[in-house]
Amino acid sequence: MAHTRKKAFDGLYAQLEETDGHVVLFSAKGEPSIIFEMTNPVQQLCTDAEQYVRFQEVLGGVLQTLGEGYALQKQDILCKQSYHHEVPEDAEFLTRSYFNYFEGREFTEIRTYLIVTQEAQRSQFVQYDPKKWLDFHAKVAKVDDMLAEKHIRHRLLTKEEVNEYCHRFMAFQFRHGSFSMTNFKASDEYLKIGSRIIRSYPLVDIDEINLPSMVKPYAQMSVNGYAIATDLFSFLTQVPFSDCVVFNQVVQIPEQRKLLRKLQGKAKRHGSMPDPSNKIAKADIEEVLDRLAVDSTLLVYSNFNMLVSCPADKVTPVTSYLETKLYECGIMPSKSAYNQLELFTDSFPGNAYAFNPDYDLFLTLSDAALCFFFKEHLKGSEETPLTTYYTDRQGLPVCIDITGKEGKVKMTDNANFFCIGPSGSGKSFLDNST
């Protein structure tokens, strides 16, 4: 009897079913996951550091709510799209001409997914535990309530949407419309899908210390001598030559007491060998133990991976761009990411527990890990009955409420405003139109 060779993508998932009011995706090892689509609450270039800190606190609260035996996976998909605006047939000629001018213009769209995964028992068979199953749905409901309470836009994906999401991830095609799949060719440096290259850039090499000693939920950049706050990875919206970037962020919450005992024993072993590297390791462990004794933080296993799709002849400039930008953040990406196919399959939604703990996961505090989560969204149209369109930084028309009081978000209750502009710029035309 001929032996059937197992493929890399065989058995990634066990089942997708709708049960107990939730659409649950089961991994090959039986870990259940529920997927939210959400919008990052911080607008890009808002310059407000407090917004980054508040979102960090929300994510920290989600981790505290989930607790041991759960993983939080967040995927930010930055994909190139072609602009299209639905214009009514009875619209005025100037309105139709205005939107036709921008038709087909390329822009970057950010779509964010938050995935809650429960760890399964490590045994030969997956055993059903009714208490764990009820706890899983209770934790998901609590996360849903927390996001709603903090006014973060989100929703649960339907069964059809989860199915399409997983298939689009496999094809690495997130443009609107139909998509197709083709053959994969894996190497130590990248994956080749048709004429495109997909390369994974893990941010952390567990064998080297290439991270900043102190990290914040935001970065500071200087504009005309003023320090403004921005996301650590805001440059992902401007990666040259790329058609799609997926930033996969995974945080696993292990059993805390067992891990604490392991760290205490490791600190003693490092202290028995007084060379510089062991002294640094012992000092780091002792600082972590002090933080855990004082603050309500968690020890977590983390993985941060950037998957970039680009033409085959543009891998070098894309790599140089990412390494330069990450170096400005004090991060040196891993140089030993030779398991490209494994990194790709482990980054699938709901596969948070598929990473190899020996070389793909690093141990840190939950506060530090959440600082590396992407927190921004791009400027979008405001919900207002008074539609006035201006172009944003990508050169696309967005609707804004020029009064500040007619839209869904009220900026002011003052009805008085004035228009400033040079001669011939259309001040009178604008005022008469509004």
State the predicted function of each range:
Residues 1-377:
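Extended, folded cores of ATP/NTP-driven motor/assembly subunits in large transport
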Residues 21-22, 26, 380, 387-392:
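Glycine-centered flexibility motif
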Residues 48-52, 56-64, 384-434:
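Glycine-rich phosphate-binding loop of nucleotide-binding enzymes
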Residues 140-141, 382-385:
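A short, compositionally biased
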Residues 378-379, 405:
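Long insertion/accessory domains within large nucleic-acid-processing enzymes
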